[in-house]
């Protein structure tokens, strides 16, 4: 007997109580673990409330890994833009689309391929056009053949009708038995 079937003798009240207790405990456990509240601050970060503190905080100089290329590397990148790696003291290239390599000297042949969606649409159109041409070609070839077969069949029926001898209904009875 299925305990979850309607009309079963097993009550679902204990199951519901266990689920409710589990949800209550879970809510208490993770209530502060994942929150979107902003942390409360007892005082202002700048000092006096309402004070503009953007000018008083010292700006830190942002250190980057790259800088502009020196003039001696002006034509270093063949198909791209030059940048200078500060830590290594070497030039590097940011290649234009369709090129790759250390100096952007190689052509990326896969870049020349169009979007796959466009290729799919073009292929479907070509397949439909070929299918239509094929159907028209088959119909054009089959129609004269069908006419020719029909004409031959009619001629054959005419010759059969001419060769056919009429069957007489006169049957003579003989007493052979």
Swiss-Prot record:
PROSITE patterns per the UniProt record, alphabetical: EGF_1 (PS00022), EGF_2 (PS01186), EGF_3 (PS50026)
Signal sequence bounds: 1-31
One Gene Ontology term, aspect cellular component: extracellular space
Domain EGF-like intervals: 65-105
Disulfide cysteine pairs (residue numbers): 69-82, 77-93, 95-104
UniProt keywords, alphabetically: Cell membrane, Disulfide bond, EGF-like domain, Glycoprotein, Growth factor, Membrane, Mitogen, Secreted, Signal, Transmembrane, Transmembrane helix
Biased composition (Basic and acidic residues): 154-167
Top-level taxon of origin: Eukaryota
SUPFAM superfamilies hit by this protein: EGF/Laminin
Ranges for region Disordered: 153-177
Residues carrying sugar: 34, 42, 52
Record topological domains on the Cytoplasmic side: 140-177
Role played: Growth factor that binds to EGFR, ERBB4 and other EGF receptor family members. Potent mitogen for retinal pigment epithelial cells and vascular smooth muscle cells.
Protein name per the record: Probetacellulin
């Amino acid at each position: 007997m299925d305990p979850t079937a309607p009309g079963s003798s097993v009550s679902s009240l204990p199951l519901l109580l266990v689920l409710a207790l589990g949800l209550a405990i879970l809510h208490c456990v993770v209530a502060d673990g994942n929150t979107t509240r902003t942390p409360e601050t007892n005082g202002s970060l700048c000092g006096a409330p309402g004070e503009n503190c953007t000018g008083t905080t010292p700006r830190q100089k942002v250190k980057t890994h790259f800088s502009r290329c020196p003039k001696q590397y002006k034509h270093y990148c063949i198909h791209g833009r030059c940048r200078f790696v500060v830590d290594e003291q070497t030039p590097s290239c940011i290649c234009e689309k369709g090129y790759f390599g250390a100096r952007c000297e190689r052509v990326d042949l896969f870049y020349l391929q169009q979007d796959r969606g466009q290729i799919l649409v073009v292929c479907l159109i070509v397949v439909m056009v070929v299918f239509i041409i094929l159907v028209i070609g088959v119909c054009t070839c089959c129609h004269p053949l069908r006419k020719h077969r029909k004409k031959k069949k009619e001629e054959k029926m005419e010759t059969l009708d001419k060769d056919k001898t009429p069957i007489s209904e006169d049957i003579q009875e003989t007493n052979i038995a």
